[in-house]
Amino acid sequence: MGNNFSSVSSLQRGNPSRASRGHPQNLKDSIGGSFPVPSHRCHHKQKHCPPTLSGGGLPATPLLFHPHTKGSQILMDLSHKAVKRQASFCNAITFSNRPVLIYEQVRLKITKKQCCWSGALRLGFTSKDPSRIHPDSLPKYACPDLVSQSGFWAKALPEEFANEGNIIAFWVDKKGRVFYRINESAAMLFFSGVRTVDPLWALVDVYGLTRGVQLLDSELVLPDCLRPRSFTALRRPSLRCEADEARLSVSLCDLNVPGADGDDGAPPAGCPIPQNSLNSQHSRALPAQLDGDLRFHALRAGAHVRILDEQTVARLEHGRDERALVFTSRPVRVAETIFIKVTRSGGGRAGALSFGVTTCDPGTLRPADLPFSPEALVDRKEFWAVCRVPGPLHSGDILGLVVNADGELHLSHNGAAAGMQLCVDASQPLWMLFSLHGAITQVRILGSTIMTERGGPSLPCSPASTPTSPSALGIRLSDPLLSTCGSGPLGGSAGGTAPNSPVSLPESPVTPGLGQWSDECTICYEHAVDTVIYTCGHMCLCYSCGLRLKKALHACCPICRRPIKDIIKTYRSS
């Protein structure tokens, strides 16, 4: 019995003679990791206990991103300090290149934000050596896919903190609690339950609206200085009642809960949609790459309309039925698709959104110049074309609008084509405008992309592909508009008149051969007039332009504004 006891004792405590020389015995498992030991042994500072502050400082090796184990969408710079997600919203899991110390702050700077997605960074730790993880085995999401596996702990950063330029620091203490702070704010409890008896690598998922991050020099935080705020004192969107279970965040970090700023809509309380599913729906409605240079113009009509978030968000502060008109900061380009997301609607009710284009530079207008109703814009002398999105809209819906080289404004709704809505003059600079109605109280510009058509986008100044037509709301075709290209006596006949009346042109049907202007289509100025508009009888269009105009919603004659019921092609005798 004595021999057996001695054998067991030496196995648990290590050889006394070797211990006296500072060489405690290490036991390795099959992959080279230390065996876990009972928690009451950790105060003896055996080598398999995690590194702590008692070492006196940070390791000589700087904290970098692991060069090989990363998601398929991650692009990493040569210094291994900065990563960027190149497309989509997921497949962007990264790890640190070495284990972190207890109380070592992993410091990240957000370098790129893409507002078309929901959710933000997922931060945490893993006891699995990233060098032993094959990159192809990484799931799309840290939450819930990765944290559902043993040895991974992570949670979503509240979206309100995921702004470009913010510095996020997070760390784990000896009790397995994870804290974080934003910039120089107080420390806040993030989650708990991390197993600290094993080495821990940092885990960063560059998810959702966070597109790029940079690792800064890590720092040690002194336990005596930690006075974390209660998590309930923080205004954050991902608050949940947490138990002591290690991976409580498995099912909770993936819920789409509305942020305090309301930038992203959410379904009614009690019916949350997982952010992963929401983003998957959005990915079907959006291209892989979006340009982010398009903004809302500072001009807005409405006492309670605000332009927020670097002029990408237009918000109506009160739900009353009042004017809420906003414009793009620059003219849209031919074949440029503009993506707009409805990010807030009141009470889950459906709402409406008007949209259109104008040749009027918003910089030349004052809010007092704009009418209460967007439909009344047609009384102005500039070209205005306005209509409403067909069908109801809800929070989270994504609209795509594009003016093609033929002057047709097409609409898509959540990736599904809704057809041509307007026919406009693509030869002139066109600013896009939006008006919020009813329950729709906030929209966001997600970005834009150029869709090449038939070999590439056409030049916006080419008269050969410049249809000029009325809008779906019976817009008045003003005299300056008809003289856009300065060709023919038609433009000169009404030269500088202020077109507050529908037209100042002859209202009788025009027969071919009665003047030079009657030989050219008043839309394309290229083909000969060969079409009669029924029922008014005017002849001012070629057949191809007449067909396009007839397809427009509430199509009307460019001369007398009567509804177009049909078009009839005519043939001249030689």
UniProtKB/Swiss-Prot annotation:
One Pfam family per UniProt: zf-C3HC4_3
EC number: 2.3.2.27
A GO BP annotation: positive regulation of long-term neuronal synaptic plasticity
Extent of Polar residues compositional bias: 1-18
Lipid addition sites, N-myristoyl glycine: 2
Enzyme class per UniProt: transferase
SUPFAM superfamilies (alphabetical): RING/U-box (SSF57850)
Entry GO MF terms: translation regulator activity; ubiquitin protein ligase activity; ubiquitin-protein transferase activity; zinc ion binding
Cellular location(s): Cytoplasm, Perinuclear region; Cell membrane; Perikaryon; Cell projection, Dendrite
Origin superkingdom: Eukaryota
Protein's membrane topology: Peripheral membrane protein
Pathway: Protein modification; protein ubiquitination
Segments for region (Disordered): 1-53
Processing after translation: Myristoylation is a determinant of membrane targeting.
Induction: Up-regulated by synaptic activity.
The entry's keywords: Cell membrane, Cell projection, Cytoplasm, Lipoprotein, Membrane, Metal-binding, Myristate, Notch signaling pathway, Repeat, Synapse, Transferase, Translation regulation, Tumor suppressor, Ubl conjugation pathway, Zinc, Zinc-finger
Main location, first listed in the record: cytoplasm
Role: Plays a role in hippocampal-dependent synaptic plasticity, learning and memory. Involved in the formation of spines and functional synaptic contacts by modulating the translational activity of the cytoplasmic polyadenylation element-binding protein CPEB3. Promotes ubiquitination of CPEB3, and hence induces CPEB3-dependent mRNA translation activation of glutamate receptor GRIA1 and GRIA2. Can function as an E3 ubiquitin-protein ligase to activate monoubiquitination of JAG1 (in vitro), thereby regulating the Notch pathway.
Quaternary assembly: Interacts with CPEB3 (via N-terminal domain); the interaction increases CPEB3 ubiquitination. Interacts with DLL1.
Protein name according to UniProt: E3 ubiquitin-protein ligase NEURL1
Organism field: Mus musculus (Mouse)
